[in-house]
Amino acid sequence: MAHAVSRAQNVTVTIRDVRGADELRACQDLQRRAWGITEDGYVLPVATMAGAQKVGGLILGAFDAQNHLVGFAFAFLGRLKGRLILYSQLTGVHPAHQSTGIGRLLKFEQRRRARDMALDAVVWAFDPLQASNAAFNLGVLGATCRIYEVDMYGARTDALNAGLATDRLLAEWPTAAEPIAGRTEPYPDGVDLIHTTVVPGLGFRKVEHISPIPPAAAHLHIKIPGRISELKAYSSSSAAREWQNALRETFQAAFAAGFVAVGFSRAEPDQPCYLLERTA
């Protein structure tokens, strides 16, 4: 088990396996709270979680000193490009405990368990438009991305996904070596693929045009909005869809050309960017 102290409320947190139906139901409640889910169809069934646990799935919980669930992570065995992996479907933290390091503890325990099972990597999907997730996954954990999935889950109506396709990047976190934090500073020779302009009077940026990848480029920058939720609120998702289409085009082109996303920079808060390097 792993232990840590939540900086926000000075709560001692224990990371351990979730046990029994009551704790699995607590995982359901936490899903609703963490992501604002109101439709039961988007919540993992207790039977699914219990069944996965019996055949190699992993459900980790973060419990406070009163044994209340404040975070959890659900993962199962999978195969990606011929490699056995631990696929992390969900990692969520109660809103009162977010940004306190609990998510990091859960991910590192997942990685330790995957290594003990002789699995090559922990893999999970995330929305490339969400800057905080990108900064955590690539910058803090040191995961990399080389696969872009178009509309991975189909249309959804929950608050986080409504109005957009569910495009996702796959984060890959190898278990063979000790993890190293990803790059967080732009490359001096990085080529910007997405060019933006500020919308007068609103303060957010929209896509102006996309540049092709120069044949000799070694490093790329792919920009995203600083605050996608605010942009969606101002534009009823139309500007967000333009951004999503731009990311889809540039990531697919970059990955096809042999680039890998290895970091994320917030040097410019209103237009953070993914950092990619050529590997082939």
PLM features per residue range, with description:
Residues 1-7, 20, 117, 130, ...:
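Intrinsically disordered, low-complexity, positively biased terminal segments
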Residues 15-95, 265-267:
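A conserved beta-strand-loop-helix scaffold within acyl/acetyltransferase catalytic domains
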Residues 38, 100, 117-118:
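Short coil/turn segments at alpha/beta junctions that flank glycine-rich nucleotide-binding fingerprints
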Residues 89, 125, 172:
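A cross-family glycoside hydrolase active-site/sugar-binding cleft signature
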Residues 93, 99-114, 133, 243-246:
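Conserved acetyl-CoA-binding loop-helix of GNAT-fold acetyltransferases
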Residues 94-96, 127, 225:
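Residue-level recognition of the GNAT/N-acetyltransferase active site
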Residues 114-127:
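Conserved GNAT acetyl-CoA-binding A-motif
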